């Protein structure tokens, strides 16, 4: 089964996961900017960093994915995927970004990334400051886990990257490559 890993990364954690996944599966990784190269692939694995509710490069890359290809979609962000409310919010956002048929056929996984405020672009620093200022005085009982985490990590360097979280994804890929169904 012809397969490819496509990733959209702004600050490096998504690229790290894509390269590690490549090592574990022997599937070539490419940036979403090269997405035109996916033609003929039967399995497309997309990893995208979460930024302001969107998945980096997904809209661009989806245009090139073969309609009949199997799709694994992996988001990478600060939100803890162990929190069901975070997952619900991420998936709600994904639904808005993807055609319905692509969303329905995608196997979706979520990984934690990291953030280093010193590395952020001016635009992203400004967005984070505005977001922080808009939520910092919210009563604790009204805060989501995602909001609490953002406030706790604001202006710091945090890294939640964990290679072990790739294990279920590798298992799913190997199952698909051996002809296994959902």
Q: What kind of feature is each model-predicted range?
A:
Residues 1-68, 171-182:
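N-terminal beta1-alpha1-beta2 submodule of the flavodoxin-like/Rossmannoid cofactor-binding fold
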